[in-house]
Design a protein with these regions (language model features):
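Long, contiguous interaction/recruitment modules in multidomain scaffold/adaptor proteins
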Residues: 1-65
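Structural marker of alpha-solenoid helical repeat scaffolds
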Residues: 69-70, 103, 137, 171-174
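Register position in tetratricopeptide repeats
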Residues: 86, 120-121, 154, 184-191
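Canonical positions in the second alpha-helix
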Residues: 65-66, 99-100, 133-134, 167-171
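Canonical tetratricopeptide repeat
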Residues: 79, 113, 147, 181-184
Length: 194
């Protein structure tokens, strides 16, 4: 197997893990009462619909109107970013996360989500400084360390990705959600040794 094929295979698997990991660990910002929907439901989207079909345009419009009325409200901008991220509309999510961070630059989870969207949009070079920014504030931030590894892997820096994940495992040794990284790190090390 060629090295670049292996790297892309590992990157694809890890991307799937990142999306699943992030979806399981996000802290959702409460929605304004006017746009609350049933848990897990998005109006107008059938079950099993592709992510882009799950974006409720009425919910987005209501939140955008609220954001326009409340320019100092970072939470509504984070929620808009989350909705677009869930729908895999990376550029829109990036826009709203950046707006939230303009209001409150200290939201480390939002910075991490911004970086994750940039990685998903194929812009890992832009994402890496975002993860570094989070890690300056919180060196053990689980999602930032994990996603930093994904960004580095996409940039062809597999050894650096493995180092980021080793740091993650060192800081969170008992976290069952990240134990699968040990095998990925071993694969990277084995490939680098050839």
């Amino acid at each position: 197997m060629r090295r670049d094929t292996l790297v892309f295979t590992v990157a694809g698997i890890l991307f799937g893990l990142v999306v699943g990991y992030m979806a399981a660990s996000w802290d959702v910002v409460p929605r304004p009462a006017a746009v609350v929907s049933a848990p897990g439901a998005r109006a107008g989207a059938p079950a099993g619909a592709p992510p882009s079909a799950r974006l409720n345009p009425d919910e987005v419009k209501a939140l955008e109107a609220l954001a326009a009325r409340q320019p100092g409200d970072a939470a509504v901008r984070v929620e808009l970013g989350n909705l677009h991220m869930d729908a895999e509309r990376w550029d829109a999510a990036v826009r709203w996360y950046r707006e939230a961070l303009a209001v409150n630059p200290g939201l480390v989870d939002t910075i991490t989500d911004l970086g994750a969207c940039l990685v998903s949009a194929g812009r890992p070079q832009e994402a890496l400084p975002e993860f570094e920014r989070v890690l300056q504030a919180d060196p053990g931030h689980r999602n930032a360390l994990y996603n930093k590894g994904i960004a580095l892997l996409q940039m062809g820096r597999a050894a650096d990705a493995a180092a980021a994940w080793e740091e993650l495992l060192k800081r969170h040794p008992d976290d069952p959600q990240i134990q699968g990284l040990r095998g990925r790190i071993e694969q990277i090390r084995a490939t680098a040794g050839k």
